């Protein structure tokens, strides 16, 4: 593993405390923005092959799925966690994030099974060296025009937030809601461990002024960012990435940018993501 790959793995997957002083002595600098991609965008959700693909693309990390429709346990199993850590080490690619996309079909707002998933995701995040856990609120878990569902989520997050706080893990809400609606939920929970997982494309599709929303939410309420397009390569669709870059700079955001979607119809994933990675690095780095 070369020096650059060592840094990637250290940041994404975590190394022992013994290794950290060594890195400090080497004065390795973590870049302001690190570039990852969702495992479900570069292959099937929950596939360990995502690390090898990410290496081919030139990514710094992979946002991995906690579980899948076929395997509700998956990364909640310590043995599976170790196989992922080994795969990340072999590829020289880190863990850029953790996501519970299965909540879209088995909703957190109403299905009690998901309480354990969210609680376990905090432990998994710690094991993988991940800071943020994406909680997905789309499809069956949509919070729009659902005050009862929103209140249920607030109550659940209030209950689990202390565990996340103790672990130093943030639970990120990704939904169709506007910035003010997200703020209302976050303020009601009242925990630094619950923030917005901001998707620039989803919010654009909803007609929100994403540049204003990013600035209004600020770095204290945005835990992480999806850089996404639907049916276009990045930089060729609806989202003005140069303005996104400026807005994120204005709020002093530092952290992962996760590429999602952004494959034109009929095009292959690998060349599309090589192009997407080049575009994002050209703008943000």
List the model feature ranges, each with a label:
Residues 41, 66-68, 101-104, 137-141, ...:
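Active-site-proximal loop/turn and secondary-structure-junction residues that shape catalytic pockets
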Residues 33-38, 62-64, 95-100, 133-135, ...:
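Hydrophobic faces of well-ordered beta-strands that scaffold small-molecule active sites
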Residues 77-81, 111-118, 146-157, 209-215, ...:
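Charged helix-capping and loop-helix junction motifs
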Residues 10-19, 25-29, 51, 85-97, ...:
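Active-site acidic/histidine proton-transfer and metal-coordination neighborhood
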Residues 51-55, 78-90, 119-127, 211-216, ...:
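Short amphipathic alpha-helices and their capping/turn segments at secondary-structure boundaries
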Residues 2-34, 43-57, 179-285:
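Histidine-acidic metal/acid-base catalytic patches
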Residues 65-83, 140-144:
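Glycine-rich, proline-tolerant flexible connector loops at the mouths of alpha/beta enzymes
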């Amino acid at each position: 593993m070369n020096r650059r790959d060592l840094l990637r793995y250290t940041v994404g997957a975590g190394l022992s405390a013994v290794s950290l002083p060594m890195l400090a002595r080497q004065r390795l600098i973590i870049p302001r923005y690190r570039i990852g991609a969702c495992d479900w965008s570069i292959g099937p959700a929950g596939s360990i092959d995502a690390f090898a693909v990410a290496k081919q693309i030139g990514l710094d990390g992979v946002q991995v799925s906690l579980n899948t429709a076929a395997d509700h346990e998956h990364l909640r199993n310590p043995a599976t966690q170790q196989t992922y850590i080994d795969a990340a080490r072999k590829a020289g690619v880190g863990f850029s994030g953790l996501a519970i996309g299965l909540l879209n079909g088995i909703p957190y707002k109403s299905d009690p099974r998901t309480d354990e998933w969210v609680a376990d995701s905090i432990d998994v995040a710690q094991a993988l060296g991940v800071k943020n856990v994406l909680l997905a609120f789309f499809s069956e878990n949509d919070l729009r025009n659902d005050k009862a569902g929103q209140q249920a989520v607030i109550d659940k997050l209030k209950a689990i937030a202390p565990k996340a706080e103790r672990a130093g893990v943030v639970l990120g809400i990704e939904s169709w809601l506007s910035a003010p609606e997200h703020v209302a939920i976050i303020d009601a929970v009242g925990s630094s461990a619950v923030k917005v997982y901001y998707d620039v494309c989803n919010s654009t599709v909803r007609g929100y002024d994403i540049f204003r929303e990013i600035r209004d939410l600020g770095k204290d309420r945005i835990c992480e960012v999806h850089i996404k397009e639907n049916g276009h390569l990045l930089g060729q669709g609806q989202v003005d990435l140069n303005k996104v870059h400026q807005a994120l700079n204005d709020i002093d955001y530092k952290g992962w940018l996760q590429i999602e979607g952004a494959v034109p119809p009929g095009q292959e994933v690998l060349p599309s993501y090589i192009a997407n990675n080049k575009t994002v690095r050209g703008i943000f780095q």
